[in-house]
Amino acid sequence: MDKPYPVRHTEEEWRRLLTPEQYQVMRGHGTEAPGSCALLREKRAGRFSCAACAQPLFDSKRKFESGTGWPSFDDPIEGALETSIDRSFDMVRTEVHCANCGSHLGHVFDDGPPPTGLRYCINGVALNFTPT
């Protein structure tokens, strides 16, 4: 995360701003346990935003049930996300992070529903939800 994102903090500041689990996932590129987040079952109309900087990321209309245990979306809000290649665990995946603060959110896969065919598999602990 060497890129100068609009929202920047020292690692010490991030540790103060985030819960230990959020820090481990969002700054340490971790993954929460599947099925562990209440946002997995969130069905109300609203918007999902970055838990680290409040950047709007996904509209609830783009959320779908993937059966994976993590909140899944087929299309982000334009300009909200950036991607990079993740080569950890002897795999090659596309990592998704917040375009505003660089925090790790999850991964994107090409096995989602039409029309995008994409599945943004996002750690629920990295999200906040605001109903509309």
What is the meaning of each model-derived region?
Residues 5-132:
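A short Gly-Trp-Pro
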